[in-house]
């Protein structure tokens, strides 16, 4: 990932992938992912349904023995995290803290992993911020940051998803936007 000559290899690989796909037929997996991730409600419904579908392959907090057609050939994932029993977004209405005289107002970008796999991290972050006088808002219209699409070479769809998320938060209502996912943060910042 790091080139001593200073060449940004990850970005170069993404651009080459994008170029190859623009000249030929896109793989079905890419087309499907682009469709699902650009339709937030569909994506979230599929994740919620996935909680039921993961039961046969769930072992503790991880999924095991996933069918190979679900994973790209170049990846050798042995274990993937299980989906949480309840997504952060489905708990927000009961969690939203009321902070009198907030020092700051923060818009929380959850990303898919934190929202659907590790909601407890977001809950702890919201509690911590509230204890320190920070008001937190959560735009339910947000979805995946789009990075998985970019990694598949779906640059246009990735940009569409990122722009949708940026529009979901009114910059006049928050002082900062916070995410616990470094990948989401760096992708949205670009």
Predicted regions and their residues:
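Iron-sulfur-cluster electron-transfer modules
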Residues: 1-142, 148-188
């Amino acid at each position: 990932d790091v080139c001593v000559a200073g060449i940004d290899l990850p970005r170069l690989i993404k651009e080459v992938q994008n170029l190859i796909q623009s000249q030929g037929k896109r793989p079905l997996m890419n087309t499907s992912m682009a469709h699902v991730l650009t339709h937030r409600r569909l994506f979230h419904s599929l994740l919620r349904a996935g909680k039921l579908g993961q039961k046969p392959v769930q072992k503790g907090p991880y999924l095991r023995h996933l069918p190979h057609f679900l994973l790209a050939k170049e990846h050798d994932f042995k274990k993937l995290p299980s989906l949480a029993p309840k997504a952060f977004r489905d708990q927000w209405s009961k969690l939203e803290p009321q902070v009198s005289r907030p020092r700051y107002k923060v818009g929380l970008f959850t990303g898919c992993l934190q929202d659907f796999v590790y909601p407890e991290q977001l809950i702890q972050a919201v509690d911590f911020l509230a204890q320190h006088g920070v008001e937190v808002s959560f735009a339910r219209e947000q979805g995946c940051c789009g990075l998985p699409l970019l990694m598949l070479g779906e640059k246009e769809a990735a940009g569409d998803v990122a722009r949708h998320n940026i529009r979901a938060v009114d910059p006049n209502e928050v002082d900062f936007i916070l995410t616990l996912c470094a990948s989401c943060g760096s992708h949205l910042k670009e």
